């Protein structure tokens, strides 16, 4: 589940679709997300994804909360960065494959190391996505 918009904003549709796909086709399900689904839905949604989602890929973007706010401009303001980290950490309890991503060339090598440290600390994998025009 990915595309234009945050998939967890239509959580009921996401869960129903994932359940149907799992039951009918037994295909792996991946969600690409900004990691703010629990803020969007005003509750911890991660346990609801257990058994429905095989991989969740969270856009980390940067290891720095201030830079994250500048880039993402979330309507949830300053609590967004910590909420995204907490969401991802919670995912490691319920979802088999948890990945956080940044895009190559958009941050420094030092920042990439800091992103790796965040992922190591919370139990997620770190992936640097290629920059594509």
Enumerate the language-model features and the residues they cover.
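Hydrophobic anchor at the beta1->P-loop junction of P-loop NTPases
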Residues: 1
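Conserved AdoMet/S-adenosylmethionine-binding subsite of the radical SAM
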Residues: 4-133
């Amino acid at each position: 589940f990915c595309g234009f918009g945050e998939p967890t904003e239509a959580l009921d549709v996401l869960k129903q679709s994932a359940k149907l796909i799992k039951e009918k086709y037994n295909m792996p399900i991946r969600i690409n997300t900004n990691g703010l689904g629990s803020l969007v839905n005003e509750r911890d949604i991660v346990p609801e994804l257990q058994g429905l989602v095989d991989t969740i890929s969270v856009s980390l973007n940067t290891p720095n909360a201030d830079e994250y706010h500048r880039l993402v401009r979330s309507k949830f303001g300053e609590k967004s960065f910590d909420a995204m980290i907490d969401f991802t950490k919670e995912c490691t309890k319920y979802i088999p494959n948890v990945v956080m991503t940044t895009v190559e060339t958009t941050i420094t090598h030092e920042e990439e190391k800091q992103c790796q440290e965040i992922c190591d600390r919370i139990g997620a994998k770190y992936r640097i996505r290629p920059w594509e025009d």
